[in-house]
């Protein structure tokens, strides 16, 4: 596991964030349904961790730097919440659920609910470096919108100096330089809000 310290130039209250990407999700139970399309989009967020994902989350819960944290805040998505639960059990820290710490939204209009459409939206997102081009067939969440959503939600926790946030890779990449973030990877950074 890689641990990095990232200093971002933001004004205001300084906060140390210990980001944790969620464990490996298990979509198989949703994919095996008679009508798996009923669980497309946010429906896929109901999937729990795989056995491997649970084991890795239990292992990462023992990470030494967690001892410096005051609270744990988790995305409300099942895979993040299950990961955060293991950390809370191990550390004894209070766990808060933050619905606005969710993953990147590939569909802001409710028009691209199938996997192919999501992949096309992601392709445009990457091609335009997190921006939204006029020729995009879908309106997805941009990097700027993701950062704004996260920072606005983070405001209510500004009285804490060190927090653990269990969330998703694309959201974490808005604040850390890592291009690839593994399941249960821990990355420390400082943010001013």
Summary of predicted features, one role per range:
Residues 2-17, 35, 60-63, 96-118, ...:
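Acidic, low-complexity terminal tails and accessory targeting/binding regions
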Residues 3, 8-97:
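Active-site-proximal alpha-helix that buttresses catalytic centers in soluble enzyme cores
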Residues 17, 70, 159-169:
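Generic beta-sheet signal
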Residues 22, 100, 168:
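Cofactor-binding loop segments of dinucleotide-utilizing enzymes, especially the Rossmann-like FAD-
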Residues 26, 80-81, 104, 171-173:
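Short, active-site-adjacent cap segments at secondary-structure transitions
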Residues 26-30, 34-48, 90-149:
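Phosphate-handling substructures
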Residues 77, 81, 151, 169:
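Conserved glycosyltransferase catalytic-site signature
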Residues 146-158:
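A short, acidic, amphipathic alpha-helical segment used as a generic capping/interface helix at domain edges
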């Amino acid at each position: 596991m890689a641990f990095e310290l990232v200093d971002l130039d933001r004004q205001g209250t300084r906060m140390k964030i210990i980001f944790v990407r969620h464990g490996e999700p298990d979509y198989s139970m949703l994919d095996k349904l008679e009508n798996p399309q009923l669980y497309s989009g946010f429906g896929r967020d109901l999937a729990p961790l795989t056995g491997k994902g649970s084991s890795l989350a239990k292992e990462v819960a023992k990470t030494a730097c967690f001892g410096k944290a005051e609270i744990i805040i988790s995305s409300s998505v099942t895979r993040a919440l299950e990961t955060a639960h293991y950390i809370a059990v191990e550390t004894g820290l209070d766990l808060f659920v933050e619905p606005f710490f969710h993953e990147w939204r590939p569909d802001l209009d409710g028009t691209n609910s199938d996997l192919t459409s999501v992949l096309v939206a992601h392709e445009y997102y990457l091609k335009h470096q997190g921006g939204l081009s006029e020729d995009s067939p879908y309106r997805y969440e941009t990097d700027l919108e993701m950062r704004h959503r996260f920072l606005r939600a983070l405001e209510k926790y500004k009285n804490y100096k060190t927090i653990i946030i269990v969330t998703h890779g694309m959201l974490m990449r808005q604040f850390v330089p890592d291009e690839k973030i593994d399941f249960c990877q821990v990355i420390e950074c400082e943010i001013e809000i």
